[in-house]
Regions:
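Positively charged n-region of N-terminal signal peptides that target proteins for export
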Residues: 1-9
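Domain-scale selection of a single, long terminal region
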Residues: 8, 20-21
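C-terminal motif of bacterial Sec signal peptides marking the signal peptidase cleavage site
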Residues: 15-19
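Active-site-proximal alpha-helix that buttresses catalytic centers in soluble enzyme cores
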Residues: 21-252
């Protein structure tokens, strides 16, 4: 009987130990943590943001690059005398009418042709005190100015000389040379480093000593070959002007 009880107790003990071992194994088995799948996104940590480069100025529409490099300056009787509208141009060889009806002179008409052919800017040399409305009286006044060495005051002035590198300079021949208003003009400005291109209208004397006088007045400028036009043919001088400009390489 005792032997039977001992056997039952031993069997119960074995079962109890087996159950405890299973529980321990269950409790000590760690559950792995849940890991979410990685998201495939670009690594931007090393990429700089696209921001405007402050070191570079913003591009703005440039102002006109068509800087007018040519100035067509001229002195003419018709724009320096108190001539009445409708004055008879046939009564004076030095008076001409433009297409718009404004009064100019022989030199002014040639200046218009040069400006149109080159794209240059017209500039009328005007005196503060006008000359007489009679051409003969004007010639006498011009002779008195020359004899006395008088430089007439000018009322027109170039405001932006730096914009021009080529200066056409036109005038009539008065008393075998330039009108004194041209000397006033040359005295007012320093054309050093610029190119002066003279043109003259005359009754047959051409430039006389005008070229050397321009060179003396503006020693720092380059003076090119000039064009002499007879006063009576000024209105029809387009071909002569075109050929001259082409020879100089200044045609537009």
């Amino acid at each position: 009987m005792k032997k039977y009880l001992s056997l039952l107790l031993a069997l119960a003990l074995v079962c109890s130990l087996a159950a405890c071992g299973n529980n321990a194994a269950t409790n000590n088995d760690p559950t792995p943590p849940t890991v979410s799948d990685p998201v495939d996104t670009p690594d931007t940590s090393d990429e700089p943001e696209e921001t405007p480069d402050a070191s570079q100025p913003e591009e703005t529409p440039s102002e006109s690059d068509d800087a007018i490099g040519i100035l067509v300056a001229y002195f003419t009787y018709g724009e320096n005398a108190p001539l009445a509208d409708g004055v008879d141009a046939s009564g004076s060889a030095s008076i001409q009418y433009r297409a718009d009806g404004s009064i100019t002179g022989n030199t002014g008409i040639v200046a218009d042709m040069i400006a149109e052919a080159t794209g240059g800017q017209l500039f009328s040399i005007l005196t503060a005190e006008q000359y007489p409305d009679s051409y003969n009286a004007t010639i006498d006044a011009g002779q008195a100015e020359k004899n006395n060495g008088t430089l007439p005051e000018l009322s027109s002035h170039i405001e932006n000389l730096e914009d021009y590198d080529t200066i056409f300079l036109g005038f009539p021949n008065w008393w075998y040379g330039m009108p004194m208003a041209i000397y006033s003009f040359l005295d007012e400005y320093d054309f050093s480093g610029k190119t002066i291109v003279p043109f003259v209208t005359s009754g047959g004397s051409g430039f006389s000593n005008a070229i050397s006088e321009i060179e003396n007045a503006e020693p720092g400028a380059t003076v090119l070959e000039g064009l002499s036009i007879g006063g009576g043919s000024a209105a029809s001088a387009q071909d002569d002007v075109a050929d001259w400009l082409a020879d100089l390489g200044l045609a537009g």
